[in-house]
């Protein structure tokens, strides 16, 4: 399970679905310039894609009192940036049948974790910079995709038990992944995005999140720090626990941002999650 084998695995993955590729083309000129009518029409033409998007946006922690029943309503409420993330998330998971048990979580728990990362990014960072929050929230939703590749590699190896045990004991999943594979799941996500010709800035951020590959400048480093905040607060071992929120809050302070606001948002998102878990 070396790095070269991972690259070969990614290179062998088939293209995304026709619907996903058509939607990607709509975003070529930027999410703010997307033709909403065409976007809704393409999503509605793919019954499974439409159903998956509606399922995700009706998640309890979004807090809608009434069920969102149409794609048009979903796009109107969430905007084109979030819809991009939802479409890409579904399209990638179509091509990577994940064995998330390698990370000691179920597929449902993995999806909930990704949604919570995106929701936290949007709710926290929108007060700081709404436009960039809209750009970063979809990335937060799909940045864990590399774990699906690594999990499948582990499941097919003789090291499954050792990997699961290592994940459960690890205080830093990225360090553990690097020791195991010579790379991290976020860098693998960058390779996946590159393979499928997704947003180039997403590729750059993911590839430099754990492994400084190039001089990316202070602005890009700042946005990478926002991803670090979110993945520290919400990850496979800790989903908005008291400890993970506190650790993420320290990063927020290092960014010279209001950590009290971050903690308030994190705990607000945590409440419905905790309620559901206890049911």
Region annotations inferred by a language model:
Residues 1-142, 149-155, 180, 187-204, ...:
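Conserved alpha-helical "signature site"
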Residues 78-79, 114, 144, 170-177, ...:
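Short, mixed-charge aromatic SLiMs
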Residues 1-5, 244-279:
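Terminal helices and disordered tails flanking the catalytic cores of nucleotide-processing hydrolases
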Residues 73, 160-188, 257-259:
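Divalent-cation-assisted or electrostatically stabilized phosphate/pyrophosphate-binding catalytic cores
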């Amino acid at each position: 399970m070396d790095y070269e084998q991972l690259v070969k695995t990614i290179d062998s993955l088939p293209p995304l679905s026709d619907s996903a590729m058509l939607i990607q083309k709509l975003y070529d000129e930027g999410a703010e310039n997307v033709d909403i009518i065409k976007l809704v029409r393409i999503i509605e033409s793919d019954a499974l894609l439409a159903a998956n998007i509606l399922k995700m946006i009706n998640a309890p922690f979004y807090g809608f009192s009434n069920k969102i029943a149409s794609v048009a309503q979903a796009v109107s409420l969430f905007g084109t940036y979030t819809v991009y993330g939802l479409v890409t998330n579904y399209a990638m998971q179509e091509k990577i049948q994940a064995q998330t048990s390698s990370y000691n979580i179920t597929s449902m728990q993995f999806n909930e974790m990704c949604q919570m990362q995106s929701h936290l990014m949007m709710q926290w960072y929108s007060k700081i910079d709404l436009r960039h929050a809209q750009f970063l929230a979809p990335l937060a939703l799909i940045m864990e995709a590399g774990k699906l590749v690594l999990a499948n590699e582990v499941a097919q190896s003789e090291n499954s038990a050792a990997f699961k045990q290592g994940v459960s004991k690890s205080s830093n999943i990225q360090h553990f992944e690097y020791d195991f594979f010579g790379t991290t799941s976020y860098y693998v996500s960058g390779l996946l995005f590159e393979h499928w010709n997704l947003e180039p800035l997403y590729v750059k951020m993911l590839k430099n999140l754990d492994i400084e590959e190039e001089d990316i400048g202070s602005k890009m480093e700042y946005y990478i720090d926002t991803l670090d905040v979110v993945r520290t607060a919400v990850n496979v071992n800790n989903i908005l626990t008291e400890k993970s929120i506190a650790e993420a809050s320290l990063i927020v302070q290092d960014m010279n941002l209001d950590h009290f606001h971050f903690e308030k948002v994190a705990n607000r998102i945590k409440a419905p999650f905790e309620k559901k878990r206890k049911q």
